[in-house]
Design a protein with these regions (language model features):
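Hydrophobic transmembrane signal anchors and adjacent membrane-proximal interface regions, especially
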Residues: 3-5, 21, 34
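Flexible, acidic loop-helix segments that line cofactor/substrate-binding pockets
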Residues: 1-15, 44-48
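Conserved C-terminal structural/oligomerization subdomain of aldehyde/semialdehyde dehydrogenase
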Residues: 23-170
Length: 170
């Protein structure tokens, strides 16, 4: 039915998916690329597909591209991950400030790199926390320290000086 991923396409090859859609592609095609013009709830393909279908779109400014990505993420995927392609630090920082994700890969492969890699500092895992955006308790890669119970002993320190509001807030 329209609006749902066809289960037979999940994990299938690009050639198989194209055949399901009545499109001829070489048997060794690695992925299908589709141009979309809408975002978020207005575009069925602007969400997780679990198959080798890549959607592309045009944009005029970096801010427009980030806004479109944010619309898609808020529809499906908030808290998870994204990848940006840029060597402009201001663009990278802007994406980091605007996008509701727990991981932003910069100029890397997201499907394997954001699950942790020796060259990006993320803990290797198959479980990616999505934080409160995704109704998870963690917003980082699940790691052994999340599975260890730690007891902390707290003892009142009598000589502690409690700061005034002025000292705290200036």
């Amino acid at each position: 039915s329209y609006g749902m991923i066809n289960k037979v396409c999940v994990g299938a090859s690009a050639h198989f998916i194209a055949a399901q859609a009545g499109i001829e592609v070489p048997e060794d095609a690695k992925f299908l690329m589709i141009r979309i013009e809408k975002y978020g709830k207005e575009e069925f393909l602007a969400k997780e597909k679990l198959c080798p279908v890549i959607c592309i779109t045009e944009y005029e400014t970096w801010e427009e591209a980030v806004a479109n990505a944010k619309t898609n993420l808020l529809n499906e995927g908030a808290g998870h991950s994204t990848v940006v392609r840029s060597f402009n630090k201001e663009h990278i920082d802007y994406a980091g400030e605007q996008l509701p994700v727990s991981r932003i890969g910069v100029n890397m492969i997201g499907s394997s790199g954001l699950g942790g890699s020796y060259d990006n500092g993320l803990n290797p895992t198959a479980t990616l926390g999505c934080g409160s955006w995704g109704n998870n308790s963690i917003s980082e890669n699940l790691w052994w320290h999340h599975l260890v119970n730690i007891a902390r002993i707290a003892i009142t320190i009598p000589e502690t000086k409690i700061p005034t509001d002025e000292e705290v807030w200036g």
